[in-house]
């Protein structure tokens, strides 16, 4: 921001100090003018000389001029002060506006962060639930696979036992057939021998 003409970088504090100092000077000048007027009145009453009167009158004019100059300077400084105060007010409002905008943006960011954090926590919880469900399903699947393996072993053992049983049955059947054949041959042989004896006995008679 550009510095106004006659305005120092000291800020509004230095302007207020200069303003107070000028006010003190004006009060001193007014007091001096009052004293000079009293002196002129006293001199008039005491019939002062014309030279002294002109000298006092000259000083009074000079003091009035200085007083007017000081008042003009004071008015100028007051104008600078009001300008500075106006700038301070504008800057304060702008700063407050920027502060409110920043706080609003910060609040929005915090809200988004909390929402994202909440979503993240929900996703983590969901993933953990899915992972836990998968582990349970894997455990169930492993249990089923073990049951299937056990059943396969039982079936395989039963098949083997059945095959062994069939083999034993065939062997037994073969043995029974063989024994039947042997017995049949023995019966036939015995029958033939009995018939032969019977015929021989008939001949002898």
Curated annotation (Swiss-Prot):
GO molecular function annotation: DNA binding; identical protein binding
GO CC, alphabetical: cytoplasm; cytosol; male germ cell nucleus; nucleolus; nucleoplasm
Pfam families given in the database record: SPATA24
Coiled coil: 17-167
Keywords: Coiled coil, Cytoplasm, Developmental protein, Differentiation, DNA-binding, Nucleus, Spermatogenesis, Transcription, Transcription regulation
Residue ranges, compositional bias (Basic residues): 186-205
InterPro entries: SPATA24
Disulfide bonds: none
Tissues and organs where the protein is expressed, per its UniProt entry: Testis-specific (at protein level).
Name of the molecule in the record: Spermatogenesis-associated protein 24
Gene symbol of the encoding locus: Spata24
């Amino acid at each position: 921001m550009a510095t106004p003409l006659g305005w120092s970088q000291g800020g509004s504090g230095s302007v207020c100090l200069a303003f107070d100092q000028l006010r003190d000077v004006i009060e001193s000048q007014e007091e001096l003018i009052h004293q000079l007027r009293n002196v002129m009145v006293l001199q008039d009453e005491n019939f002062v000389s014309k030279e002294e009167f002109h000298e006092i009158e000259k000083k009074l004019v000079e003091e009035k001029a200085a007083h007017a100059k000081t008042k003009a300077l004071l008015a100028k400084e007051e104008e600078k002060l009001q300008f500075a105060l106006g700038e301070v007010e504008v800057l304060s409002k702008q700063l407050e506006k920027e502060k409110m905008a920043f706080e609003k943006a910060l609040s929005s960011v915090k809200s988004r962060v909390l929402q994202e954090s909440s979503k993240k926590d929900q996703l983590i919880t969901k993933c953990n639930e899915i992972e836990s469900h998968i582990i349970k399903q894997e455990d169930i699947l492993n249990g089923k696979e073990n049951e299937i393996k056990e059943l396969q072993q039982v079936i395989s053992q039963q098949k083997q036992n059945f095959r062994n049983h069939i083999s034993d049955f065939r062997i037994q059947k073969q043995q029974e057939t063989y024994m039947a054949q042997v017995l049949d041959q023995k019966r036939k042989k015995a029958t033939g021998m009995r018939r032969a004896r019977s015929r021989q006995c008939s001949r002898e008679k």
